[in-house]
C-alpha cells in the first residue's frame, strides 16, 4: 500500500513527460557529443535560444501565427516578488513564487456591507495567473516542487504597505495552488526565505478569442447553416471570477504530520500446519513500523519523541516546523525494546516497536479452550434418571472413584458471603432441566447445560443452602450466564451441608452436596434462581451402598438344595446341588411374615407363592441334566436291564454350605480332541484342558457324554487350580458330576479419554486385532513344514481309533467326522506354533 501511494505521489508531482529514447538513439548521441565540432554547434544553438532578442522574435512570430487563426495571444513574463516555503502533502518540500506582470489586470474594490454583522467594508477582486509546476532542487540538492502565481504589480505594492492585504494575497495564492493541482499545503509551517524568486523565470501564455475575426472566418462555411444554432449573447464574455472565502479558515498552531503504520510479520512454517492453534496469531504482527513524514525538519534533535505501550507522541516547537502527533497503537508493544531511525534524505522518522504476545500459560489455556470446543461428540446420550447398580459396587471401588473424581475435578471459586454474589449488570437464567439423586448422605445435582467453562464456576456455600453460578460459550462465542440456588427442606432441621463440589462436563454440570452424618435422607429440596424465587422439587432416586461383609455373610449362609433321582432304565443316578436362590429366600421371609398378617394377606401371599413355585419348577426342569454310567470310570455295566418308565421318588434336603466340585474323564486325551468351549486358553506352552459347551443340546441317542478332558491329574490341577479334584473312590459323588461354569465377581471396567470417541476406539481395537492375526499367520514359514507334517501325521493316527480316546458323553458325534479332521489339523498347527515359540 505504501508503494502504490509513493507511485501516485510521483505521478502527481512529476508532470514532465519521461524521455523515451532507444538504445540506438542513445549511442548516436554519445558518438555525436564525442565530436568537438558537434559540441560547438550545440552550444551555439543554446546561446541563440537564450538570447533575449531572439526570444522577442520568437514571441512575435507565435503571436502573428495565432492571430491568423483568430486567437489573441499574450506572453506573461513573471517578475520577482517574494517566495513562500511550505510542505506538499506532508511529504515534499515546495516553493511558491509570488510574482508580478503588467499583462495581469489591476485589483479592483467596491464598497460592500457584511450581511452577518452589518459593518461596511471593501470587496476586493484580485486577478491572477498561474504557470505549470516544475521540479527543482533546494540548497542541499534535494528534490522539491516550484509553483508560480502572478499578480499585477499594484497588488504587490499594496501587500508591502498593508499587512492584511498581504495575508489576503498569500491565502489567495495557496488556495489557487491547492484547487488547481489537488494537493494539500502545510499552512501552519509557512516560511518566507530571503529570496525574490526560486529557479529560472519561465514565461507563460494567455490565449483568448480575438475581437476582430479574420477574412477567412468571415466567409460562411458551407456546413454552418445545416442546423439551427443558438444566437450568441450580446456583449463581451466576462472572465471567470473565483469567490473568496467569507470566513477565513482557522489555521492550527501545530501541524499533524503524515504517518503510516505497517504490520511486520515473519514467515513461520508452523502456521501452515493443521493444528488447532496454528493460525491463532496470524493477525497479530511481530512488530509495528510507524513512519512519520517530517519534511521541514533537518534532524531529530529539533523534536521530542515519547513512546509508551499503547501510544506514540511527537512534538516539535521549531519555528517553521511545528509538529504535534498523538497516535494510538492497535497492539500492546514493548517500548523498552523499540528503535527509531531518521532518514535525512527523505526527512522520514521510522519507529520499530515489537508487539507483546501472550504468555505461555495463556496460550496453553487458549489451546485447551479450542480443543474443548472442537472435540467430537461421542454419540452417547446421558440419561439422568437411569438407575445404576450402586448396590453391587463394593466400598473399595466406590471410594477409589470418589478419589479419582476429586483429583480430576476443576477447582471452583468460593465467594465471600458479604459481597453480592450475582452481578446486577449481568442477566442470569435458571437451567431449564436439572435432576437430583441421593446416595447415602450425598445429594448429586445434574444441571443439563452444555459447554460450561470450568473457570467460570463460582459457589457461595452456607449451612443449609448453596448458590452456584457459571457461564457457557455458544457457537458465536457469546457468553450465557446461569445461576442455581438450592436449599434443604425445612422438614429436616438437623441436616447441614458440610462441603460441596461442582464439576463441568461436556453436556452438563454435576453438583455434589455432602451432608452431615446426623442428616436424614431428604425427600425433596428447594431450588431457584436465588433465595427469593424458590420452588420445591422431589428427589428422583435414593440409593444405599450395601456393606461388603453383609453381602458375603449372606452368600455364605445361603442354604443348598440337593436333589437325587434314580433311573431304573439306565441305572443312572442324578444328583443336583444348587444354592438357595433369591426366590426361596423371599419365600422363607414371606412365611415368617405370614404369621403376623391377617388371613386375607395370607391368601394373597399363597397365590404369589404358587406362581413363584411354578416358575422355579420350570427353571429346574430346564437346568437339570443327567449323566450316563459311562461318565464315571468306576461304574461299568455288563448286561442291559429291562426298560422301565417308572422313576424313583426324589428327596430334597438341605446340606451345609460347601464348595462345588467337578469331575473329569481320565480316558480322554487333550491332544486328540479340539479345544472348543467358553473357557479361554490359559497358557501358550502349558497343557490346555478342554471343556465342552455347557449350553450345547444333548441327544438321547448319542453314545458320548459331555465331560471335562485333561491329560492327567497333575496337569489338570495346574490349569484349574481353583477347582479341587474329586475323590474317585466315592461312587456317589462321581455319579453326581455336573458341568458348571463359574464367573468371577470382579467387574472389569474400561476408561476412555475425554477427547476420544467410541467409534475411534473401536477402529483402533480392530486394527490391533488385525495386526495380531497377521503376525500369527506369518509365523508359519516354509522352514517349519516338516514339523507340520509330523504333527499332522500323529493327529491323523489318533483319528483312526477314536473309540480308544473318547468316552460316551451323550452327544452324537458320528456325523461330525469332517469337523474332527479340521479340529485335529488345527491342533497340529497350534502344536507346531508352540514348538516355534520354544
UniProtKB/Swiss-Prot annotation:
UniProt feature, compositional bias: Polar residues: 114-125
UniProt similarity note: Belongs to the PIH1 family. Kintoun subfamily.
Biased composition (Basic residues): 612-623, 673-683
Entry keyword Cell division: no
Comp. bias regions, Acidic residues: 389-398, 583-592
Segments of skewed composition (Low complexity): 601-611
Protein's UniProt name: Protein kintoun
Molecular function GO labels: protein phosphatase 1 binding
Comp. bias (Basic and acidic residues): 370-380, 557-572, 789-802
GO cellular component: cytoplasm
Species of provenance: Drosophila sechellia (Fruit fly)
Function: Required for cytoplasmic pre-assembly of axonemal dyneins, thereby playing a central role in motility in cilia and flagella. Involved in pre-assembly of dynein arm complexes in the cytoplasm before intraflagellar transport loads them for the ciliary compartment.
Subunit text: Interacts with Pp1alpha-96A, Pp1-87B, Pp1-13C and flw.
Ranges annotated as spanning the membrane: none
GO biological process: one example: axonemal dynein complex assembly
PANTHER family according to UniProt: PIH1 DOMAIN-CONTAINING PROTEIN 1, PROTEIN KINTOUN
Annotated coiled-coil segments of the chain: none
Region (Disordered): 106-125, 212-238, 370-411, 557-696, 776-838
Classification via InterPro entries: Kintoun (IPR034727), PIH1/Kintoun_subfamily (IPR050734), PIH1_N (IPR012981), PIH1D1/2/3_CS-like (IPR041442)
Keywords annotated in UniProt: Cytoplasm, Phosphoprotein
Main localization, broad class: cytoplasm
Localization per Swiss-Prot or TrEMBL: Cytoplasm
Residues modified to Phosphoserine: 378, 781
Amino acid at each position: 500500500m505504501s508503494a502504490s501511494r509513493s507511485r501516485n505521489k510521483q505521478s502527481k508531482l512529476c508532470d514532465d513527460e519521461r524521455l523515451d529514447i532507444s538504445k540506438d538513439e542513445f549511442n548516436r548521441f554519445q558518438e555525436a557529443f564525442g565530436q568537438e565540432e558537434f559540441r560547438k554547434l550545440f552550444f551555439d544553438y543554446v546561446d541563440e535560444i537564450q538570447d533575449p532578442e531572439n526570444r522577442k522574435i520568437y514571441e512575435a512570430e507565435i503571436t502573428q501565427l495565432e492571430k491568423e487563426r483568430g486567437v489573441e495571444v499574450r506572453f506573461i513574463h513573471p517578475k520577482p516578488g517574494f517566495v513562500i516555503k511550505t510542505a506538499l502533502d506532508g511529504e515534499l518540500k515546495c516553493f511558491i513564487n509570488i510574482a508580478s506582470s503588467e499583462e495581469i489586470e489591476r485589483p479592483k474594490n467596491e464598497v460592500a456591507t457584511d450581511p452577518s454583522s452589518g459593518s461596511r467594508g471593501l470587496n476586493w477582486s484580485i486577478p491572477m495567473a498561474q504557470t505549470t509546476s516544475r521540479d527543482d532542487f533546494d540548497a542541499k540538492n534535494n528534490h522539491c516542487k516550484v509553483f508560480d502565481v502572478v499578480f499585477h504589480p499594484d497588488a504587490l505594492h499594496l501587500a508591502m504597505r498593508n499587512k492584511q492585504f498581504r495575508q489576503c494575497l498569500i491565502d489567495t495564492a495557496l488556495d489557487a495552488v491547492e484547487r488547481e493541482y489537488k494537493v494539500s499545503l502545510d499552512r501552519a509551517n509557512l516560511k518566507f526565505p530571503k529570496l525574490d524568486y526560486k529557479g529560472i523565470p519561465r514565461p507563460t501564455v494567455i490565449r483568448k478569442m480575438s475581437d476582430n475575426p479574420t477574412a477567412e472566418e468571415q466567409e460562411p462555411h458551407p456546413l454552418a447553416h445545416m442546423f439551427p444554432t443558438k444566437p450568441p449573447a450580446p456583449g463581451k464574455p466576462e472572465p471567470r471570477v473565483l469567490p473568496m472565502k467569507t470566513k477565513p479558515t482557522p489555521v492550527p498552531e501545530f501541524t499533524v504530520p503524515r504517518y503510516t503504520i505497517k504490520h511486520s510479520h515473519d514467515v513461520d512454517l508452523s502456521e501452515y500446519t493443521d493444528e488447532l492453534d496454528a493460525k491463532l496469531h496470524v493477525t497479530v504482527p511481530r512488530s509495528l513500523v510507524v513512519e512519520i513524514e517530517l519534511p521541514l525538519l533537518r534532524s531529530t534533535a529539533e523534536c521530542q519523541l515519547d513512546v509508551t505501550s499503547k501510544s506514540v507522541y511527537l512534538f516539535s516547537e521549531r519555528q517553521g516546523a511545528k509538529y504535534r502527533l498523538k497516535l494510538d497503537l492497535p497492539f500492546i508493544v514493548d517500548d523498552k525494546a523499540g528503535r527509531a531511525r531518521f532518514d535525512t534524505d527523505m526527512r522520514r522518522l521510522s519507529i520499530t516497536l515489537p508487539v507483546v504476545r501472550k504468555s505461555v500459560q495463556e496460550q496453553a489455556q487458549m489451546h485447551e479452550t479450542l480443543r474443548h470446543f472442537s472435540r467430537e461428540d461421542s454419540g452417547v446420550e446421558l440419561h439422568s434418571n437411569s438407575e445404576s447398580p450402586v448396590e453391587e459396587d463394593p466400598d473399595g471401588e466406590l471410594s477409589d472413584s470418589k478419589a479419582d473424581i476429586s483429583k480430576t475435578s476443576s477447582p471452583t471459586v468460593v465467594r465471600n458471603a458479604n459481597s453480592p454474589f450475582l452481578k446486577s449488570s449481568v442477566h442470569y437464567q435458571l437451567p431449564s432441566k436439572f435432576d437430583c439423586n441421593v446416595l447415602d448422605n450425598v445429594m448429586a445435582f445434574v444441571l443439563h447445560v452444555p459447554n460450561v467453562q470450568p473457570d467460570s464456576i463460582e459457589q457461595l456455600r452456607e449451612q443449609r443452602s448453596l448458590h452456584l453460578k457459571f457461564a457457557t460459550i455458544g457457537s458465536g462465542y457469546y457468553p450465557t450466564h446461569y445461576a442455581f440456588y438450592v436449599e434443604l427442606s425445612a422438614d429436616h432441621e438437623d441436616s447441614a451441608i458440610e462441603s460441596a463440589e461442582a464439576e463441568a462436563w461436556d453436556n452438563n454440570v454435576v453438583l455434589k452436596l455432602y451432608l452431615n452424618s446426623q442428616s436424614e435422607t431428604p425427600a425433596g429440596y428447594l431450588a431457584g434462581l436465588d433465595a427469593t424465587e424458590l420452588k420445591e422439587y422431589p428427589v428422583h432416586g435414593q440409593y444405599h451402598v450395601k456393606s461388603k461383609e453383609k453381602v458375603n455373610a449372606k452368600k455364605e449362609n445361603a442354604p443348598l438344595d440337593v436333589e437325587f433321582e434314580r433311573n431304573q432304565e439306565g441305572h443312572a443316578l442324578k444328583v443336583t446341588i444348587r444354592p438357595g436362590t433369591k426366590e426361596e429366600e423371599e419365600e422363607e421371609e414371606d412365611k415368617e411374615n405370614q404369621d403376623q398378617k391377617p388371613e386375607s394377606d395370607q391368601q394373597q401371599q399363597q397365590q404369589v407363592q404358587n406362581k413363584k413355585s411354578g416358575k422355579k419348577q420350570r427353571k429346574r426342569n430346564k437346568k437339570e441334566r443327567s449323566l450316563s454310567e459311562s461318565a464315571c470310570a468306576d461304574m461299568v455295566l455288563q448286561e442291559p436291564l429291562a426298560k422301565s418308565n417308572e422313576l424313583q421318588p426324589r428327596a430334597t434336603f438341605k446340606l451345609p454350605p460347601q464348595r462345588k466340585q467337578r469331575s473329569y474323564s481320565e480316558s480322554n486325551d487333550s491332544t486328540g480332541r479340539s479345544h472348543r468351549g467358553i473357557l479361554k486358553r490359559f497358557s501358550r506352552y502349558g497343557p490346555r484342558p478342554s471343556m465342552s459347551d455347557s449350553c450345547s443340546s444333548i441327544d438321547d441317542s448319542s453314545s458320548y457324554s459331555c465331560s471335562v478332558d485333561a491329560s492327567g491329574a497333575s496337569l489338570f490341577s495346574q490349569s484349574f487350580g481353583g477347582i479341587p479334584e474329586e475323590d474317585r473312590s466315592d461312587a456317589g459323588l462321581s455319579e453326581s458330576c455336573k458341568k458348571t461354569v463359574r464367573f468371577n465377581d470382579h467387574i472389569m471396567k474400561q476408561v476412555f479419554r475425554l477427547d476420544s470417541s467410541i467409534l475411534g476406539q473401536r477402529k483402533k481395537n480392530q486394527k490391533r486385532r488385525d495386526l495380531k492375526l497377521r503376525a500369527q499367520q506369518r509365523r508359519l514359514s516354509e522352514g517349519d513344514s516338516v514339523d507340520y507334517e509330523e504333527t499332522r501325521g500323529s493327529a491323523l493316527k489318533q483319528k483312526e481309533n477314536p473309540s480308544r480316546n473318547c468316552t460316551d458323553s451323550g452327544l452324537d458325534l458320528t456325523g461330525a467326522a469332517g469337523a474332527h479332521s479340521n479340529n485335529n489339523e488345527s491342533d497340529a498347527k497350534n502344536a507346531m506354533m508352540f514348538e516355534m515359540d520354544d
